[in-house]
Structure formats: C-alpha cells, structure tokens
Amino acid sequence: MFVRFARFEGTDPATLDDRVERMRQEIESVKAGNPPEGMPPEAGEVLRSSVVRVLTVVDHSDGTEGSAVFCATEEDLKRVDELLSAMSPPSAGDGHRVDVAHYEVVMDVEV
C-alpha cells in the first residue's frame, strides 16, 4: 500500500467543514462513475480505479488540513499524484497546497 500525503494551508476556518463535505460528495461521485463537473471522465476513471482510501485531517483553529490518498500499488500512486498535482483547490478561501509527499505504508494496525 502506498500513500500520497498533501498539506494545505490558508483555508478559511469558517468554511472548512463545507470544503470537506464538498470533497466527500466529489469522492462519492467518482466512486459512482460520475465525475464532478469540471473533471474529465478519464481523470475520474483514474481515481476510481486507483484510489482505495482517502483520509482527511483538519485543524479548525487555523484552517490547515492534510489529505492522505491510499493506492494499492506504486504505479497507481504515480498516476494519481500526476492527476492531483495538476489540480488546485477550486474556490477562494479553500487554501493552497504547501507540501506533497509519498510514502509506503509499512504498518496499519487498529487497536
């Protein structure tokens, strides 16, 4: 398992929950095979076929967030990274990406 972790800053804390809900709806649309408006169908198919899990964490006090996108293979991760790196948060107040890193998941334990 491989993960792409992106950090964002500058999101308006007052709109953070709305942004997360919008992302959740977009992910559900992609899962259903109906990419959201503005996303080419090919991009939706890459995400649908390559992403196995998305985890988002936020700090409501300052509007920072992190997004972990999990892929089964390193090849899938590279395809997803290329696609996501070309995207930016769509709205004013949605902040900007400040860092992206790739990792291999070597332990995932629930306790």
What are these regions (language model features)?
Residues 1-66, 72-83, 93-111:
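Short S/T/G/P-rich N-terminal loop/turn motif that feeds into the first structured element of a domain
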Residues 89-90:
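Helix-adjacent hinge/juxtasegments
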